[in-house]
């Protein structure tokens, strides 16, 4: 989890590195192609619109499972990771602008959408068209309904039904995010079939081409060649990597809790991973609640106590603090890991401190008021 100014840029870099690693393993392009002409900054980072943030002294270092990337002095270097096992992820980037997909009808016909949003739109459209029944949303006991005949989305409950573009701003932010993540979760876990397409045939051709390149590369030792061949040949996505900007967007605190619980439930299955960015102290504190619930669950052996525990944090949303990292960014852009206690993030953090500062300022106002009455 990341919070404070600059967090989105870091999330976008992480998404870019993760996709590049996957693309190299899959054989979309060669290392030589990637490292020439400053393509990393000018081409691949422009996808996330962060190319203008680069400076002459920009230094980036990413260590993945299959490759290690270093950007320094405007040069991009790629090194294979020997001995590591690479599992191919289904990468889903959920941008903060996602509510546009709810507000604008026929969004697929709009030109010049930001590329991450356009990619999300493609998955969102596929999810809607493959929807066999209404999707239960995690807040307010409502469902997402897609009318395939008229190509319109609705929010409905037991006593009302409204078009998504007329629903609350919270619903407009929540719905596309939840529809996309639920669909991709089911694709990865094989709950819904993956549609075969011309793209999948092209992908097979790229894999065969990549295998041929590996076999011809005399610079690789036998072990490196074996690992790269295994990674390239396994073309299925093994887990869901969800990168979500501001899941709390336009939502009341109690709804933020339900959203976080749902996101954590997706993460609790298999090797799924989740990266969140947030401005919300509620998200951070509800995360601490989920970690504490996991700790308490190891001590509970009474059925009534277990029911009380699950009423606070559902079993699927409880998470081991050892699997969680929280980072805050200071005013200079320095990234700092938040200290933890029993796996829970420290409450001495920027978001909570801002709440405390607000209380202090209010107390100062009361003091001024009292002095006026003296």
PLM ranges: what are they?
Residues 1-22, 159-371:
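Switch/communication elements of ASCE P-loop NTPase nucleotide-binding domains
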